Amino acid sequence: MERLLRVDRRILFAFVAAAVTIPLLIKFDLPVPATKEVRGIYDKIDSLPEGSHMLIAFDYDPASKEELQPMAVALLHHCFKNNIKVVGMTLNPGGTGLADSAITEVGKEYGREYKEDYVFLGYKTGVELVMINMGENIYSAFPKDFKGNSTTDMPALNGVQSLQDFDFVVDLASGSSIEAWIAFGKEKYNFDLGAGCTAVIGPDMYPFLQSKQIEGLMSGLKGAAEYETLINRKSSAVAGMSPQSVVHVLVVFFVIFGNFLYFMTGRKK
């Protein structure tokens, strides 16, 4: 038993590497039932009539891409499939490229036209000040879009003057922007808000769910996988759940087995 306690850590790393690689090669899907938190966002979007306006804030950067980009893509598929007009923006300077590529690629897949069915406003610094400005007049906050076009005559923004005119707003965040959207957006201008975040932030968002300040929550890769399942379009998030789940099981086994060996060795001594 003492030999097992002194096992080379490189052997453990090899087991973890195998636990990641083998599920990717075999490509098996684990069941991903949707939780009520994720279903809250799905049901809200599904209830919107055609032609509704939805704002998606891509408030994350490439460091959080693996968790949040699948959420963004799944949301966009749902919106474009339901003929909802999408307005994108970001309060994170690292999110512009990710947001633009996601909106453009998914929009083309559904034959949607830029300025007619969707628009990307781009990045603006200020966070809370930007939200307050958008709450008063969106054209004052973003007189031009990401590509330099004037926003005042865009069909995708017809009927939208401020945040209050959006039928739904979703913030995808790798930082503290969700709290800002609640305090300086929803509570001040009274619109429906949903949220997506990295797994490490997820537990901090549940009080906002319980207080009904957000309609729903997608947390981490699991949240993205649940949304992919709901829209019946399994992609990178669902594929990533298999290796993640196997690694989690392996780590739990190592912890239990290591503690068992430690106590058994102590009893012998």
List the model feature ranges, each with a label.
Residues 101-128, 211-229:
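Structural recognition of alpha->loop->beta junctions
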Residues 115-199, 203:
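Membrane-proximal low-complexity regions enriched in glycine and acidic/polar residues
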Residues 3, 196-269:
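C-terminal functional extensions of proteins
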Residues 30-47:
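Alpha-helical transmembrane signal-anchor/signal-peptide segments
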Residues 42-70:
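Short extracytoplasmic
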Residues 10-26:
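Hydrophobic membrane-insertion alpha-helices, especially the h-region
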Residues 63-119:
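Membrane-embedded segments
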Residues 54-61, 86-90, 169:
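Short glycine-rich or small-residue beta-strand-to-loop segments that form or flank ligand, phosphate
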